[in-house]
UniProtKB/Swiss-Prot annotation:
Reported function: Catalyzes the reversible oxidation of malate to oxaloacetate.
Catalyzed reactions: (S)-malate + NAD(+) = oxaloacetate + NADH + H(+)
Native organism taxonomy: Bacteria, Bacillati, Actinomycetota, Actinomycetes, Mycobacteriales
Gene for this chain: mdh
Protein name, as recorded: Malate dehydrogenase
Molecular-function GO term, any one: L-malate dehydrogenase (NAD+) activity
SUPFAM superfamilies tied to this protein: LDH C-terminal domain-like, NAD(P)-binding Rossmann-fold domains
Organism: Mycobacterium ulcerans (strain Agy99)
Length: 329
């Protein structure tokens, strides 16, 4: 185990997602049993005492791969030299808050974090945004980090991707490993479009295997898109462990690459592919290699899918307009 530790910064580290995420990272779930990890944990001042308790638990696990932990409330110190930043912390949506209120509340957070990353992160930094509204938070952070290549920023739609795989596996009676080429298009919101029409079940087209357009439209798409709200209703709290697991999955795929016969969903900077306006952070089917992603090209988009992709892209454009008017980008 001679490799130098990967410096992983996590924001909102004492929160619910952070609590699930840190132990996965420290145990080697990200890069396997041979690469040590140094955790750099950012929290707001009132949460630092709770974070100290989490660090005690990390210590008590005696993880062989955990080479060190640093905590603090100063982003410039915590992000210093970071190779991977997982921006989990965000202002939660409270009762009566509209999404526009959420955009404004989180704008200041991601503006400051983008600037700090720009100043002190390592040259090979990759930034994954989990905190909602994730796509536009990623856009704000990216815009405030002009010296970091824009393709180094991504927002999390892997949770939606995993949810879609799980639902399709249950419907078709196969293992989740039998499903390939699932795609989430657009925003990590209720407008997202989980696309079965290019997915495969044991090598066969998923939509043809399902052979039930009503199920796709009336059950599959809304179940995946609104799963977070359903979990809140059942659990009394938002999905934390699954979001943490998806954050690890997404970072691992980004850093280590996708299999030759599969792709993943990542919200990345649009180059205009599939009619999604250039400059938005939108989810696409992507392949990854050597820490870089590429949007899968050449997929046929039917009329049904076109309408869904356009709808979620329009929401992203509205969010971009809102944060532009707020002076955040």
């Amino acid at each position: 185990m001679s490799a130098s530790p990967l410096k992983v910064a996590v924001t909102g580290a004492a929160g619910q997602i952070g609590y699930s995420l840190l132990f996965r990272l420290a145990s080697g779930s990200l890069l396997g049993p041979d690469r040590p990890i140094e955790l750099r944990l950012l929290e707001i001042e009132p949460a630092l005492k709770a974070l100290e308790g989490v660090v005690m638990e990390l210590d008590d696990c005696a993880f062989p791969l955990l080479s060190g932990v640093e905590i603090g409330s100063d982003a410039n110190k915590i992000f210093d030299g970071a190779n991977l930043a997982l921006l989990v912390g965000a202002r939660p949506r409270g009762p009566g808050m509209e999404r526009s209120d959420l955009l404004e509340a989180n704008g200041a957070i991601f503006t400051a974090q983008g600037k700090a990353l720009n100043e002190v992160a390592a040259d090979d930094i990759r930034v994954g945004v989990t905190g909602n509204p994730a796509n536009t938070n990623a856009l704000i952070a990216m815009t405030n980090a002009p010296d970091i290549p824009r393709e180094r920023f991504s927002a999390l739609t892997r949770l939606d991707h995993n949810r879609a795989i799980s639902q399709l596996a249950a419907k078709t009676g196969v293992a989740v490993t039998d499903i390939k080429k699932m795609t989430i298009w657009g925003n990590h919101s209720a407008t997202q479009y989980p696309d079965l029409f290019h997915a495969e079940v044991k090598g066969k087209n998923a939509a043809e295997v399902v052979n039930d357009q009503a199920w796709i439209e009336e059950y599959f798409i809304p179940t995946v898109a609104k799963r977070g709200a359903t979990i809140i209703d059942a659990r009394g709290a938002s999905s934390a462990a699954s979001a943490a697991s998806a954050s690890v999955d997404a970072a691992r795929s980004w850093l280590l690459g996708t299999p030759a016969d599969d792709w993943v969903s990542m919200a990345v900077l649009s180059d205009g592919s599939y009619g999604v306006p250039e400059g938005l952070i939108s989810s696409f089917p992507v392949t990854t290699k050597d820490g870089n992603w590429s949007i899968v090209k050449g997929l046929e988009i039917d009329e049904f899918s076109r309408g869904r992709i356009d709808k979620t892209a329009a929401e992203l454009a509205d969010e971009r307009k809102a944060v532009t008017e707020l002076g955040l980008i």
